[in-house]
Amino acid sequence: MFGKVSSLLVFASFLIIQGAFATLVAPIGDLEHLSEIELLYTNRVLPSKIPLTPFVKRDDDSSSTQASYSTTVSDVVIVTDKSWSDGVETIFPYSYTEYQPSTTYTSAPAGSIGYAASIPNTGRELMESGSPVRFSKSSLLIVSLLSIAAFAALVL
């Protein structure tokens, strides 16, 4: 009896972790047409579309390859990667995601930054990722399969 209860607890924890990953990853809209997309935050649509300008430059920008520009709408983070080519600065939208006030998760690569409100409708704080963190649909599928395999191994 105890073995079955513990296996159910393990399976439930796998499902919780999988669900957490799924909620953290959900890009909104089409990255090809950023200016035409309205961003969603919880159950409401933000009143404005994604602004492509103005971009905010970091004061401590010293690297020519480090992402140092970002723009936000309310609690939504839009991260951009910056690169230099022949002395000309080029800004590429990399990704954007709903900001989760309880976490510092970002889908941006290492060195990318974004500004976001730590609490809705308050001041903004700097978020910077220290390492690449990406969860794709395929990685979620792997987590799902591992969950099922672990459950089957514990129950059988």
From Swiss-Prot:
Regarding the membrane, this protein is recorded as: Lipid-anchor; GPI-anchor
* Location in the cell: Cell membrane
Where does the UniProt annotation place the signal sequence? 1-22
Question: Do the record's keywords include Cell membrane?
Answer: yes
Query: Which top-level group of life is the source organism from?
Result: Eukaryota
What GO CC annotations are associated with the protein? endoplasmic reticulum; external side of plasma membrane
**Where is a lipid covalently linked (GPI-anchor amidated serine)?**
129
Annotated keywords = Cell membrane, Glycoprotein, GPI-anchor, Lipoprotein, Membrane, Signal
Instruction: Identify the propeptide residues.
Output: 130-156
This protein's record includes keyword Lipoprotein:
yes
The protein's name is: Uncharacterized protein C24B10.06
Species whose genome carries this gene: Schizosaccharomyces pombe (strain 972 / ATCC 24843) (Fission yeast)
